[in-house]
Regions:
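N-terminal beta-strand motif that seeds the catalytic metal site of vicinal oxygen chelate
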Residues: 1-19, 69-72, 121-126
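Core segments of cupin and vicinal oxygen chelate
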Residues: 2-3, 10-52, 88
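Conserved short beta-strand elements that form part of the metal-binding/catalytic scaffold
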Residues: 29-67, 108, 114-121
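Conserved S-adenosyl-L-methionine
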Residues: 32-34, 94-97
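Short hydrophobic/aromatic beta-strand element in the GNAT-like acyltransferase core
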Residues: 42, 73, 93, 104-106, ...
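Mid-chain, well-packed structural core segment of small domains
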Residues: 71-83
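A beta-strand edge to alpha-helix "cap/lid" segment located at domain peripheries
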Residues: 76, 88, 119-123
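Short, small/polar residue-rich loop motifs at catalytic or cofactor-binding pockets
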Residues: 100-102
Length: 126
């Protein structure tokens, strides 16, 4: 089987505020923003270089409360550079956490959903 994750729903309270954060602060691409009906708005945002997107919106039918996602983990090339870029854009992010299995930067979106950004270790170094 060949499976690829396409979309992760991220529960938010204010769609416009969340969209601005993800696009302006984190550099996500705004792929789609459509008000389908009065009750339904679907916004798809994709991290640069990712084949998987997130969806935020209104009336999407999810049962998760805004801010309840405890960890969404993505891979980044350089934890130090990403941390510096985030802080330069005013994003509150924790400093680099060094672990044997990678280097991590943690942040929260305006609703409190937690993102962990992981720089993978250089396994070729032996």
């Amino acid at each position: 089987m060949d499976w690829k994750i396409e979309l992760i729903f991220v529960p938010v309270t204010d769609v416009d505020r969340a969209k601005e954060f993800y696009v302006e602060k984190l550099g996500f691409n705004a792929d789609f923003d459509q008000r389908v009906t009065e009750e339904l708005r679907f916004v798809q945002l994709t991290p640069p270089g990712s084949a998987c997107s997130i969806a935020i919106g209104e009336g999407l039918g999810g049962t998760l409360a805004p801010g309840s996602l405890d960890v969404i983990q993505v891979v980044i090339p350089d934890a130090d550079a990403v941390l510096a870029e985030l802080r330069a854009k005013g994003v509150e992010a924790e400093g680099v956490d060094e672990q044997p299995w990678g280097r991590f930067v943690t942040l929260r979106d305006p609703d409190g959903n937690r993102w962990t950004l992981q720089q993978l270790p250089d396994y070729s170094a032996g």
